[in-house]
């Protein structure tokens, strides 16, 4: 009987306060997070930024209990999915591969090989494809496969995106309906979808499908909610978690909250549309930062739809995805990791100088300039960063 390995890919997160610095270092060491024209500066800059941001990030994690629950929740999702698949007669074992913290992708691959798995289904826990999330994880897995002859022997099927999965849409709709029903004026409550943002250049210059998939997903969810409740709620779609000086997808969530308050919205339901697990961006950014902004701008009832986590209907939807992947047309790892031809991401040593910032998260030229300035400030022990208290 075929032994199927289901590889769940996610971002990862620091589980303890002392893990925050190393986690940030891993994150910013990824050349797809910070784009630099010279690879030699990647790790020094990652060290500098992670050192600079560590204190603020530690405070954020302290506010949610001292660490990210992402690993614990993802492992719970893996166990529930494994059980659901075995109940369908599929001999499956689930594995977790985090991009920037434990358990890393390398560890999951070693476990898969040790368990004598015959076929692997790769399922990113990002419903919407982006070259910086699912794409980065697919390419990391491909990199590991290229240097591992034993891993190359395994059949690998990939699920690239699943924003329109029936179980996912239905789960989101049910959770939204629960919050609407708890409002004093259900049909007057405003729904604010908030998705993790990406740089505008990813979409407009690099052809990233992320924005289109997010928009289509929101429409599917709203349609499901309207059919269930029998009335329509007004809604907006916004983007959060912007990092760095580059323009990201708009509108930004914090600005939308201010505008909604100014327009007289009193009951607000915030829906984290691109997150399937509770983590720092739901528990701290939305529940603390955004809630404060909303209340300060006249919104009285601020409600946040909980993340899907192990919601049974959602887990069943994931099982549907895996079953369909095993029986349907195969999408190889190479196909899943493939980028639009105009995107320059790999290999890093081929990046060129210039002023076109296609597919950049941070503009490499600006980052290089800032790095040089910061380096000299560290050497001389004086400057603007010392003046404002960052150094």
UniProtKB/Swiss-Prot annotation:
Pfam families: Ferrochelatase. The keyword Metal-binding applies. InterPro entries: Ferrochelatase (IPR001015), Ferrochelatase_AS (IPR019772), Ferrochelatase_C (IPR033644), Ferrochelatase_N (IPR033659). It catalyses: heme b + 2 H(+) = protoporphyrin IX + Fe(2+). Coiled coil: none annotated. Pathway: Porphyrin-containing compound metabolism; protoheme biosynthesis; protoheme from protoporphyrin-IX: step 1/1. GO terms for biological process: heme biosynthetic process. Transmembrane segments: none annotated. This is Ferrochelatase. It comes from Prochlorococcus marinus (strain SARG / CCMP1375 / SS120). The gene is hemH.
């Amino acid at each position: 009987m075929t032994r199927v390995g289901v590889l769940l890919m996610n971002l990862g997160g620091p589980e303890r306060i002392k893990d925050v610095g190393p986690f940030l270092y891993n994150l910013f060491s990824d050349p797809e997070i910070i784009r630099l024209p010279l690879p030699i500066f990647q790790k020094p800059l990652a060290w500098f930024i992670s050192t600079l941001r560590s204190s603020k990030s530690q405070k954020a994690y302290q506010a949610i209990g001292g660490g990210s629950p992402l690993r614990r929740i993802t492992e719970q999702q893996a166990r529930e999915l494994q059980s659901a698949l075995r109940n369908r007669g599929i001999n499956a074992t689930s594995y977790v591969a985090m991009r920037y913290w434990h358990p890393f992708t390398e560890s999951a691959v070693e476990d898969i090989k040790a368990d004598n798995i015959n076929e692997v289904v790769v399922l990113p826990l990002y419903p919407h494809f982006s070259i910086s999330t699912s794409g980065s994880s697919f390419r990391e897995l491909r990199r590991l496969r290229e240097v591992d002859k034993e891993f190359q022997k395994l059949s690998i099927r990939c699920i690239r995106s699943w924003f329109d999965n029936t179980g996912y849409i239905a789960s989101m709709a049910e959770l939204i309906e629960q919050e609407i029903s708890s409002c004093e004026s259900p049909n007057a409550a405003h729904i604010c979808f908030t998705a993790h943002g990406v740089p505008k250049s990813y979409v407009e210059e690099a052809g990233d499908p992320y924005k289109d998939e997010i928009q289509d997903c929101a429409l599917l969810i709203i349609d499901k909610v309207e059919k269930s409740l029998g009335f329509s709620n007004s809604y907006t779609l916004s983007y959060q978690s912007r990092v760095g000086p580059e323009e990201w997808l708009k509108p930004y969530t914090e600005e939308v909250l201010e505008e909604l308050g100014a327009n007289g919205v009193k009951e607000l339901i915030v829906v984290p549309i691109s997150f399937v697990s509770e983590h720092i961006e739901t528990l701290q950014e939305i529940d603390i930062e955004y809630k404060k902004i909303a209340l300060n701008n006249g919104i009285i009832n601020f409600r946040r739809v909980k993340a899907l986590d192990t919601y049974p209907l959602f887990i069943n939807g994931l099982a549907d995805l895996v079953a369909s992947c095993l029986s349907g047309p195969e999408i190889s790892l190479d196909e899943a990791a493939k980028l639009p031809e105009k995107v320059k991401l790999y290999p890093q040593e081929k990046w060129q100088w210039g002023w076109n910032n296609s597919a950049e998260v941070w503009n490499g030229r600006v980052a290089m300039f800032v790095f040089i300035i910061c380096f000299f400030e560290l050497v001389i022990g004086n400057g603007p960063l010392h003046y404002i208290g960052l150094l």
